[in-house]
């Protein structure tokens, strides 16, 4: 009798520990799964109208650090199908970039933004590469960007040129900019002939 009671007493805490360990393991597995989803490499796609507010918020949050020009929500909504967005495993927009037409042969990358937590992971380069492919597929010969940090884009094949080499940009935007005569941005251009003719991730209208 005593031996059986001792056996039951020993078994009870062991069973409890087993159940606890089992629950803890299940919780840990669930947490790891959520972590894997959050860390999953963002997917690129063409923005849709419902993305406009999130893109606007992303640009506003990074306006100072990224030296970004302000954008109105109404403008973004009107031009939403020019944007490519990076979406993480939870469906949040963590990056964006716009392919803006300047002429029949020249397009510009605008509002290139990567959220702070996603920087340093190559997402900006993925966006630029995707915008290059889309520009080539749309029939443009050259792609330009105006940047405060030219080295970043130089590593992706862009070259610094005089602003006057881009009269389309000057006519479209620069003349109305309050910093027109004291612009601190570098004008940069890349020739799209070297970009492979592959299908873009999703259709982009420009």
Task: List each model region and its residues.
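Conserved beta-strand in the GNAT
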Residues: 85, 92-101, 105-113
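A generic "binding-loop/recognition-motif" signal
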Residues: 51, 105, 148-149
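Short amphipathic alpha-helix that is part of the acyltransferase structural core
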Residues: 32-70, 87-88, 92, 185-187, ...
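Conserved acetyl-CoA-binding loop-helix of GNAT-fold acetyltransferases
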Residues: 114, 120-135, 145
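Short, low-complexity intrinsically disordered segments enriched in A/P/G/S/L with frequent Arg
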Residues: 7-12, 16-18, 22-23, 30, ...
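Conserved active-site alpha-helix within GNAT-family acetyltransferase domains
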Residues: 137, 141, 147-175
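A short helix-loop-beta-strand connector motif used in the catalytic cores of GNAT acetyltransferases and
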Residues: 75-90, 108, 181-184
């Amino acid at each position: 009798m005593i031996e059986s009671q001792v056996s039951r007493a020993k078994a009870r805490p062991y069973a409890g520990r087993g159940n606890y360990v089992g629950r803890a393991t299940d919780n840990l597995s669930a947490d790891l799964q959520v972590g894997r989803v959050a860390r999953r490499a963002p997917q690129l796609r063409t923005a849709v109208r419902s993305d406009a507010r999130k893109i606007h918020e992303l640009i506003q949050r990074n306006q100072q650090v990224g030296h970004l020009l302000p954008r109105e929500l109404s403008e973004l909504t009107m031009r939403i199908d020019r944007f490519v967005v990076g979406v993480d495993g939870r469906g949040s927009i963590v990056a964006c970039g716009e392919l803006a037409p300047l002429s029949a042969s020249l397009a510009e990358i605008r509002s290139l933004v990567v959220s702070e937590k996603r920087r340093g992971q190559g997402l900006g380069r993925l966006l630029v590469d995707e915008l290059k492919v889309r520009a080539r597929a749309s029939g443009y010969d050259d792609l330009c960007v105006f940047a405060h940090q030219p080295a970043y884009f130089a590593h992706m094949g862009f070259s610094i040129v005089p602003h006057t080499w881009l009269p389309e940009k000057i006519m479209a935007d620069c003349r109305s900019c309050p910093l027109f005569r004291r612009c601190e941005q570098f004008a940069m251009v890349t020739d799209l002939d070297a970009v492979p003719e592959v299908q873009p991730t999703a259709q982009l209208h420009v």
